[in-house]
């Protein structure tokens, strides 16, 4: 999400009262930030985010996009499923944060190269703040274009998700453990 060494300083340089996470593979719609600010004000949440609307252009990318939006593909997180209702969430895709809440919990942890949002949302929730999902917020996401890039992405995501669990043991959930448990079970036979 953030280039190495930058994530920890983003919140200090933000000029306004919100900090928006942006991903190189995501395309925010023209009203994304305005809608997010309205949701922050209406809900009182510390972070709001929405649908990761995966769309591919090649057959491979379309297949990956279909897997991303399947309950079986990435575990059925609300931000992957278009029919998910608005409400509190463990995490959201490309959140828009209240700067004051971000600073109150120490901001993005620069020791995480990836999974900063998962880790930060954990700290926000455990400080009594709310993370809010709304399907009104939609980001077009462009999946990796080949098997090698996708495998590399998932490998690194898994490494950093494991680090979040090591740092915050009670953040482990079946959704994140299902894939590695399945792989180990298949390998053991």
What are these regions (language model features)?
Residues 168-189:
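Alpha-helical bilayer-embedded segments of polytopic membrane proteins, i.e.
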Residues 50-56, 67-94, 103, 162, ...:
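Short, flexible, basic/aromatic active-site loop/helix in glycosyltransferases
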Residues 84, 88-98, 109, 115, ...:
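A conserved catalytic-core signature of glycosyltransferases
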Residues 109-172:
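Catalytic donor/gating beta->alpha subdomain of glycosyltransferases that bind UDP-sugars
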Residues 27-62, 66, 138, 142:
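Conserved donor NDP-sugar-binding/catalytic core segment of glycosyltransferases
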Residues 17-27:
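Short beta-strand-to-loop acidic/aromatic patch adjacent to the donor-nucleotide binding site
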Residues 7-18:
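Active-site nucleotide-sugar/metal-binding loop of Leloir-type enzymes
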Residues 100-104, 138:
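Short, well-ordered alpha-helical scaffold segment located
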């Amino acid at each position: 999400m953030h280039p190495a060494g930058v994530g920890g300083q983003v919140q200090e340089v933000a000029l306004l009262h919100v900090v928006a996470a942006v991903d190189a593979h995501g395309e925010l719609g023209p009203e994304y930030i305005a809608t997010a600010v309205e949701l922050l004000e209406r809900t009182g949440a510390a972070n709001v985010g929405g649908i990761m609307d995966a769309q591919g252009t090649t057959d491979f990318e379309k297949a990956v996009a279909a897997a991303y939006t399947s309950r079986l593909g990435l575990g059925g997180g609300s931000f992957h499923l278009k029919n998910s209702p608005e409400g509190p969430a463990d995490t959201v895709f490309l959140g828009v944060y209240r700067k004051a809440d971000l600073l109150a919990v120490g901001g993005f942890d620069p020791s995480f190269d990836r999974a900063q949002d998962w880790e930060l949302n954990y700290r926000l929730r455990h400080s009594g703040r709310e993370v809010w999902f709304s399907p009104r917020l939609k980001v077009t996401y462009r999946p990796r274009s080949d098997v090698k890039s996708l495998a590399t992405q998932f490998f690194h995501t898994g490494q950093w998700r494991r680090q979040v669990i090591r740092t915050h043991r009670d953040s482990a959930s079946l959704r994140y453990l299902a894939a590695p448990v399945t792989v180990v079970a298949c390998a053991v036979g």
